[in-house]
Structure formats: C-alpha cells, structure tokens
C-alpha cells in the first residue's frame, strides 16, 4: 500500500483533487468517489489541510482502483470526443480543398478550350483573307506556311517539356531572330516592332514609373508571378483612364497630318534607337533569369503563347521584353546587352524602306482629331469617366491607323493592324482595358467578316423590305362555299358572302385559339339573313356604313353595318336591313361601289349592267348592254383614275369601257382571238388599276392580261396559274396584284416587273373549284381569300 500511495503521488500532477474536510468527531471525510463511491470524479488528495485532529490524519491518502479506472475512462471519453470533432473539421476542409481544386481544373480546361478556339479562329481568318485577296487581286497572299494549329495534350506537355536551362540567353536570341524573320516576311519593320513592343508592355502592366527607370528583380518577379498584394491590385485596377493613357507613350508624338509615321521616324535620333535596343536587352535578360528560377512563372507565361505563335505578328513577340515608356540613362544599362547582337545597319535600311512605303499614303484622309473627340463626347458624358483634353489630343484611334495601313499596303501584303486597346480606354474604362488585355487582348477584336462583303449583298437584298404574307386567321362558320368577301375601309372587320344564303361579319380582333393550328379562329359577330338563295357578290361603301350583296335570287340587299363590338347574342335588329334593290331578272354576279358619287354598279346573268343610287326613290339610274350586244357580263368595276367611266367584262372574252353619263361604250378591250377560241377565253374578273389607265382581266384559260384604257390594246399577257384564274385584287397603292385560282393558290405579283413575288396555298378543292375571291384591306396590312371549302382565310 505504501508503493501504491507513493506511486499515486504522480497523479497529483494531472489533476488537483478536492481537499478532504473535517467531519463531526474530528475525522476527515473524503469527497465522494474517493473510496469507489459513484460520484467520484478524481483521485483523493495525498495531503491534509488544517491542523492534525486525530491519529488517522498522519496516514497519507490512498488511491483506489475503481477511482483511477473511472478517471481514465472519463479522460478517454473526452479525448475521443475532441478527436471526432477534429475528424469532422478535417473532412470538411478536405472537401473544400477538393471543390476548389475541381474549380481550378475546370477553369484551366475552359482556358485551354478558349485558346484552342482562338487559334482555330485565327486559322479560319487567315484562310478567309487569303481567299478574299485571291478573288480581289487574282494572286495568292503570301502568309508563310499556313498550317492547322496543333494542340498537345497535357500529359505530353508534362512529359516532354524540358526544364529551362540556367543560361537561356542563347535560346532567347535564337527565338528572337526567328520571330523577327517571320515578322519581316509578313511586312513588319523594326520601327513598328518597337512601337508595338512598348504598347504590349504598357498593356501587360510591365511599365515602371520610377524616376531613374530601373527595374528591380524583386518587383519584376512579383509582376510576373502575380505576387502583388490585393491592395496593390485594387489600386492598379482603380487607376483613372488618364493614368492608363499616359502609359501609352508611343502616342505622344501623334500628329494630324498624313505623314505622321514619317515624321515620327525622322524625329527619332540614332542614339534613342540604340537606347531602345538596350532596353529590350535588359528586360529580356531579367525575364530569362526569372524564368529559370521560378517554374510557376514559366507556366504563367505559357498562357500567352498563342500571341507569340500568331503568324500575322500582332506585335505579341515583343511581350517578352519589359520596361517602361521613359528613356533610361546609358549608365543604368546592363553590360549583358550584347546578347541580342542587333545589326544597326539593317535597322537603318529597313527604316528607309518604311519611309518609302509611306510615300504613297498621301491620298488617305484620316479622322480629324477634333471629330474624334466629338464622337467620343457623343457616346454619353454620364457613362464615361472624365478624361483630360490633353490626353485625348495625344491619343489616336486604332481604327484610323488600321485604315491607313490598309490603304497603303493593300496591294502588297496583309494590312497591318495596331492594337485596338487605345480606343477602348475611352469607352470601357481602365479596369475593363486591363481585363480585356490580360484576357483575349487584340484577339477579341478579330472578325472573319470583310467590309467589302456588305456590298455583295446589296443586289440580293433589293426586295428585303417586301412584306411576306403568312396565314393568321381562319373563318370557319359558313356551311357552304364562300363566294365573296370585302374589308371595312378602316376597321379590322371583314364581311363574307356564302352559298349558304348568309353574309357574316367578322371582327379580327376577337379571336379564339385554334385547336391544331398556328392560326387563330374567329367567330362571326353578326349574320345577315335576307337572300333566298346563294349570295354571289359583295360591296362595302367607302365610309364602311353600308354593305350591298347580290344573290342568285336576282336581288341586291342593302345593309346597315352593325358595330364591330356588337354582341353576337343580342336580339334581332330589323334596321340592319336598309332595303332591297330589285331590277335584275337573274343572278347578280358582280357589284362595285364608288365613294365619289355614292353609286353602285351591278352586273347580272340577265345580260344587263345597272347603275344604282341607293339613296334615291328610284334607285336604278341607268342600264347598260340591254340588248346583250357584247354578251353576258361577268364582272364590273369603276375606272380608278376616272370614276366617270366603268369597265365590264363579258363571257365572250372581251371587256368594254362605258361612259356613265352617256351610257355609251367608249373602248373595246380585246386580245384579238379567233371567235372559235372565245369559249375558252371567258373572263372571270376585271379590275381597274387605282392610279394608272390600265385594266386587268382574269381568264378561264389561266391567263392574266393587261390592257391600255386609252387604246384598248393588250399591253401584257401572262400564264399566271395552273388552272382558271377566278379573282383579282390590286393593293391600294397600285404596286402589287393578287390573283386567286382554282389551282388552290394565291399569287402576289409585282405590277412593275410582272413577276410573282409570293405564292400561298390557301384552300382545298371542292367539285374542281377552289378560290372564289381575294381582297386587300384598304388601310391595314391584311389580305383575305374566300374558297369553295367554306373557309375564309386572312393573312398578315
């Protein structure tokens, strides 16, 4: 027990046990659980507190096995609980890491896919340019070796990519010489390369605004590795547009004259050329050293490989050089500048060659700087940031540069296009410019469309504004063939006359969706009932307040038009039927109304044509062809350009123009056919042109013929349909003619060229008959057809 008691002393270091208390009678009472009681939570104390009160206090406290086991179990349970919490947190963090890694992988795949798309678009653009150049100039465009872009898989890239050597200056030199050779083949000179290199460096944020112009290796490494702090990135993005434009130093000497590039070249001293070359050396050397030290930097720069490999140059090869737009002192130059081994004589020779090329550019006018500023201002002051006027005056539109180069070198090589980011800063803002440059850059402005292609489409689009008619409404309530129809002069209202002895009024704005068709069904709002037999003809007054119908019962019914908003289930109104015109003795086949004198013309199978004034007590004013000298009339119409005359067609194949005042026939319109063929030359419909002295007739022999009202001679004849032409209508402007036929088709004709511009299959045949009537709306974009299938259709 002494060993146990002594060994238990080590337990005091783990937890402080409660002190024993002195109970009644001077004995110490242990806390619960000290002797194995159920409530014990820790080992008993080994020392007593207070003065000794009896012989038992001198003995040290003893531990019990149950108490120790209970303590161990308690601590083990607490440890397991903490471990479970830790496992849960660990699993959550692992899931978060996996999610972020998946997102990163997806973004990388998306980036690679976009780069591949860009390369394919570049390839397609070059092919289109070569094809256009060959079509325009008849010669092949020299673009070097035009090859399909190749894409290596990620596994191959990881395996085959060797680590960058420590001394890679030689590799940089060889690559630069090869790239310069490619650019010279495309037509790029060293001066343009210098300008574009400064441009790319500025857009990539590699410029430095320090006074001495030195680039520290640490700052360069931070820029390449994206190691700026979030605060620095925020400040960079929030720069005003003016600061962004000030970095485009190659625009400072821009001039309005046509010799801008020429003056710029002449104004560059030879010393500055050398200085610019030395700047490229320093930037490239520092960049190469950083690439060998940091593999992440090399991987980041590979994202811009598509800029380097573009065959048209685009100046992206200069993206490897870093520096700012300010001139550096010669004392600051690195002695490693000889790495590039630049031939000064070659540069001078190329500059002279470039000057000569710019001589032929004088005829090209550029956008005036003032006009450019006005155009930028017109884009909206509320949407654009404030830009100092000096910066605007120093800037040049990239599109004008592209136009100048295209005008000067169109016959020689591909047009040289400068980066378009300079103009973007006015419209997009500095942060958008930064994002666009670091994203797709100049490739975002690529297009396969040539400006000259728009002119090719002009002849093809000559009739682009011509309306194409499509079926919209189907009128289904008649029980037999619809013989005639007419539109209200102003409202979207239609009246139809049918062989079921009725006329129906339709409001096209009150529609019901059809069950199995894209068109809309319209229910009639009123039904006119007075005829004893089929209704054959129809006419509406010019004000739309009266309607006239002629039927097989030899009567002409005169109707007052109900309101377009009438309730279909209202009680019968007797005042709708205004009267009946009785004079004919056989079926009335044609009606025509003139709003000038409010007169009505009718032609009947009894051989007569009658002129009516419905308002008079004796409505029949005059009768024509009483002796049937010309045959049986089939159709009648007022002359559009001379309402004092009318034209009537006959079943003999001729048409006659009458003077309404004298009742005499003035002109006989005949196509001079033999009498034996007149039976097949039956005229079904005659209409007069609304503005020209021309009469148009529809014949049973599938022809449509045009006659001169003054001479009576036929001026044109054409086979218009596959079956008999039954109906004609001329639009209110006199531009188009619509014809209907028993071949189930409606055809729209251009009256100027006499050509069919649209054909619509509208109705089905019934007893070898199909379309009875067609009509234009006088003031709205509606046309309609009436058919033997008991349907009327409206097209819009």
UniProtKB/Swiss-Prot annotation:
GO MF terms here are: armadillo repeat domain binding; calmodulin binding; protein phosphatase 2A binding; protein-containing complex binding; protein-macromolecule adaptor activity; small GTPase binding
Question: Where are the N-acetylmethionine modifications?
Answer: 1
* Residue positions, PTM Phosphoserine: 202, 214, 229, 257, 334
Tell whether Phosphoprotein is among the UniProt keywords: yes
Residues of the region (Calmodulin-binding) are 166-183
Modification type Phosphothreonine: residues: 150
Q: Which Pfam families match?
A: Striatin, WD40
Q: Where is the composition biased (Acidic residues)?
A: 253-264
Gly residues composition bias: which ranges?
1-13
Instruction: Name the SUPFAM superfamilies on file.
Output: WD40 repeat-like
Record's subcellular location: Cytoplasm; Membrane
Tissues and organs where the protein is expressed, per its UniProt entry:
Mainly expressed in the brain and muscles but is also detected at low levels in various tissues such as kidney, spleen and lung.
Residue ranges of the WD repeats are 477-516, 530-569, 583-622, 678-717, 720-759, 766-795
Q: Which Gene3D superfamilies match?
A: 1.20.5.300, YVTN repeat-like/Quinoprotein amine dehydrogenase
* InterPro entries membership: G-protein_beta_WD-40_rep, Striatin_N, WD40/YVTN_repeat-like_dom_sf, WD40_repeat_CS, WD40_repeat_dom_sf, WD40_rpt, WD_repeat_striatin
Q: Which UniProt keywords apply?
A: Acetylation, Calmodulin-binding, Coiled coil, Cytoplasm, Membrane, Phosphoprotein, Repeat, WD repeat
Residue ranges of the region described as Caveolin-binding: 71-79
Location of region: Disordered: 1-60, 252-271, 311-335
Q: Which residues form a coiled coil?
A: 77-136
Tell me, in one coarse class, where this protein mainly resides: cytoplasm
Recorded topology in the membrane: Peripheral membrane protein
What family does the entry list?
Belongs to the WD repeat striatin family.
The record's note on quaternary structure and interaction partners says: Tetramerizes. Part of the core of STRIPAK complexes composed of PP2A catalytic and scaffolding subunits, the striatins (PP2A regulatory subunits), the striatin-associated proteins MOB4, STRIP1 and STRIP2, PDCD10 and members of the STE20 kinases, such as STK24 and STK26. The STRIPAK complex can be extended by adapter proteins such as SLMAP:SIKE1 or CTTNBP2NL. Interacts with CDC42BPB.
The record's PANTHER family line, in alphabetical order, gives: STRIATIN, STRIATIN-3
As for what it does, the entry says: Calmodulin-binding scaffolding protein which is the center of the striatin-interacting phosphatase and kinase (STRIPAK) complexes. STRIPAK complexes have critical roles in protein (de)phosphorylation and are regulators of multiple signaling pathways including Hippo, MAPK, nuclear receptor and cytoskeleton remodeling. Different types of STRIPAK complexes are involved in a variety of biological processes such as cell growth, differentiation, apoptosis, metabolism and immune regulation.
Q: What is this protein called?
A: Striatin-3
Species per Swiss-Prot/TrEMBL record: Mus musculus
Source organism phylogeny: Eukaryota, Metazoa, Chordata, Craniata, Vertebrata
Recorded name of the encoding gene: Strn3
């Amino acid at each position: 027990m002494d060993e146990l008691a002594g060994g238990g002393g080590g337990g005091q270091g783990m937890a402080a046990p409660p002190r024993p208390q002195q109970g009644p009678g001077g004995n110490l009472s242990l806390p619960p659980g000290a002797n194995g009681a159920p409530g014990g939570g820790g080992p008993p104390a080994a020392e007593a507190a207070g003065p000794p009160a009896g012989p038992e206090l001198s003995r040290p406290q003893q531990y019990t096995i149950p108490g120790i086991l209970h303590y161990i179990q308690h601590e083990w349970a607490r440890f397991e609980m903490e471990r479970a919490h830790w496992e849960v947190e660990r699993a959550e963090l692992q899931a978060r890491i996996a999610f972020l890694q998946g997102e990163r992988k997806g973004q990388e795949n998306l980036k690679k896919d976009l780069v591949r798309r860009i390369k394919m678009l570049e390839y397609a653009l070059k092919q289109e340019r070569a094809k256009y150049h060959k079509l325009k100039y008849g010669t092949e465009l020299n673009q070097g070796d035009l090859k399909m872009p190749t894409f290596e898989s990620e596994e191959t890239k990881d395996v085959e990519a060797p680590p960058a050597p420590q001394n890679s200056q030689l590799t940089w030199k060889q690559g630069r010489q090869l790239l310069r050779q490619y650019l010279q083949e495309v037509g790029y000179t060293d001066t343009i390369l210098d300008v574009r290199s400064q441009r790319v460096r500025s857009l990539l944020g590699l410029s430095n605004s320090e006074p001495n112009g030195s680039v520290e290796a640490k700052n360069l490494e931070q820029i390449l590795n994206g190691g700026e702090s979030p605060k620095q990135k925020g400040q960079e993005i929030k720069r005003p547009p003016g600061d962004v434009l000030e970095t485009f130093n190659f625009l400072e000497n821009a001039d309005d004259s046509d010799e801008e590039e020429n003056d710029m070249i002449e104004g560059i001293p030879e010393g500055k050329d050398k200085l610019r070359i030395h700047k490229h050396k320093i930037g490239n050397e520092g960049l190469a050293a950083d690439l060998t030290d940091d593999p992440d930097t090399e991987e980041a720069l590979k994202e811009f490989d598509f800029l380097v490999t573009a065959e048209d140059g685009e100046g992206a090869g200069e993206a490897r050089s870093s520096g700012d737009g300010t001139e550096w002192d010669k004392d600051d130059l690195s002695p490693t500048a000889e790495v590039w081994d630049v031939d000064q004589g070659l540069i001078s020779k190329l500059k002279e060659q470039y000057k000569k090329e710019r001589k032929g550019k004088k005829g090209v006018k550029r956008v005036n700087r003032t006009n450019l500023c006005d155009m930028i201002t017109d884009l909206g002051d509320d949407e654009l940031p404030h830009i100092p006027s000096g910066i605007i005056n120093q800037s040049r539109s990239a599109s004008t540069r592209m136009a100048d180069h295209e005008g000067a070198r169109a016959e020689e090589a591909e047009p040289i296009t400068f980066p378009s980011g300079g103009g973007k800063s006015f419209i997009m803002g500095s942060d958008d410019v930064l994002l666009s440059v670091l994203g797709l850059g100049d490739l975002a402005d690529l297009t396969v469309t040539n400006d000259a292609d728009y002119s090719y489409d002009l002849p093809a689009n000559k009739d682009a504004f011509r309306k194409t008619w499509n079926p919209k409404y189907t009128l289904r309530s008649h029980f037999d063939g619809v013989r005639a129809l007419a539109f209200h002069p102003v409202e979207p209202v239609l009246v139809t006359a049918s062989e079921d002895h009725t006329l129906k009024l339709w409001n096209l704005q009150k529609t019901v969706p059809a069950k199995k068709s894209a068109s809309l069904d319209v229910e009639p709002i009123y039904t006119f009932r007075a005829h004893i037999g089929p209704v054959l003809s129809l006419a509406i007054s010019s004000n739309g307040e009266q309607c006239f119908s002629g039927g097989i019962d030899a009567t002409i019914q005169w109707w007052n038009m109900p309101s377009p908003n009438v309730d279909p289930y209202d009680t019968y109104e007797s005042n709708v039927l205004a009267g009946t015109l009785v004079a004919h003795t056989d079926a009335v086949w044609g009606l025509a109304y003139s709003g000038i004198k409010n007169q009505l013309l009718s032609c009947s199978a009894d051989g007569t044509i009658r002129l009516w004034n419905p308002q008079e007590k004796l409505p029949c004013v005059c009768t024509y062809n009483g002796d049937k000298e010309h045959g049986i009339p089939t159709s009648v119409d007022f002359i559009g350009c001379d309402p004092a005359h009318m034209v009537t067609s006959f079943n003999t194949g001729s048409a006659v123009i009458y003077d309404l005042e004298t009742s005499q026939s003035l002109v006989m319109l005949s196509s001079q056919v033999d009498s034996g063929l007149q039976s097949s030359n039956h005229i079904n419909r005659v209409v007069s042109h609304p503005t020209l002295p021309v009469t148009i007739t529809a014949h049973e022999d599938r022809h449509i013929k045009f006659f001169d009202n003054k001479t009576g001679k036929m001026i044109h004849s054409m086979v218009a349909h596959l079956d008999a032409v039954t109906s004609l209508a001329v639009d209110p402007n006199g531009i188009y003619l619509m014809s209907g036929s028993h071949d189930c088709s409606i055809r729209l004709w251009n009256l100027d060229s006499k050509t069919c511009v649209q054909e619509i299959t509208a109705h089905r045949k019934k007893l070898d008959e199909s379309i009875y009537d067609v009509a234009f709306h006088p003031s709205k974009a509606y046309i309609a057809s009436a058919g033997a299938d008991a349907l009327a259709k409206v097209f819009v």
